[in-house]
Amino acid sequence: FAQIKGGLIVSCQALETEPLYSSKIMARMAFAAKEGGAVGIRANTPEDIIAIKKEVDLPVIGLYKVDYDNSEIYITPTMKEIDAIMTAAPDIIALDATNRKRPDGSTIETFFPEVRKKYPDMIFMADCASYEDGMRAQKLGFDIVGTTLCGYTPDTKGTEIPCFPMLEKLAQDLTIPLIAEGGIWEPQQLQKAFA
């Protein structure tokens, strides 16, 4: 975490329905991000993670977005996606840590202990929507908390992003690293996040 602390992590992701969808393009975007001063990359799918790691020597936060009909969770929702990401050797794996039902019917409180048991040495980032999610994630043994999903879940829809009140409260109460994520588009917002 020391390599990314206090720096900008750039998300290099494109879904199949988007014009820049290609592992080669995401790798070039990661290269451009590094040239621009990024200290880390957030990437979706094992293929993109592999391509990006070949292109840049920055830490990669890997995730795998998959839609399931029976769950709102789409960021690394099941063990199947975690297993797939592990083949790409990311530095960190991000997964939805909200208190919603996963595709297999489990919650983060029952799912994450299984993940940690299977991959005890991996660094895991909790993508959270609320203060409560972040504190729960720390208690469950996540290594990093992110404000990724604030404003994107039914309970937080309509919340102004970036979610500075949530960020401030988590920064005071967490003992693990916190990543401000989501809705940071302007330098002033970034400065406020670091304040």
Would you name each region that the model predicts?
Residues 1-2, 31-34, 49-57, 108-120, ...:
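Surface-exposed amphipathic alpha-helices with a cationic face
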Residues 1-21:
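N-terminal amphipathic alpha-helix/helix-capping segment at the start of soluble metabolic enzymes
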Residues 5-10, 56-70, 111, 116-129, ...:
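Short beta-strand/loop segments at the ligand-binding rim of alpha/beta enzyme cores
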Residues 9, 40-42, 61, 93-96, ...:
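Conserved beta-strand positions in the central sheet of alpha/beta enzyme cores
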Residues 23-27, 74-80, 106-112, 159-167:
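Charged helix-capping and loop-helix junction motifs
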Residues 57-106:
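Glycine/small-residue-rich loop that forms an oxyanion/phosphate-binding "nest" at active or ligand-binding sites
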Residues 71-85, 129-143, 176-180, 184-195:
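Catalytic cores of alpha/beta
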Residues 90-104, 130, 135-166:
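Glycine/Thr-rich beta-alpha phosphate-binding loop at enzyme active sites
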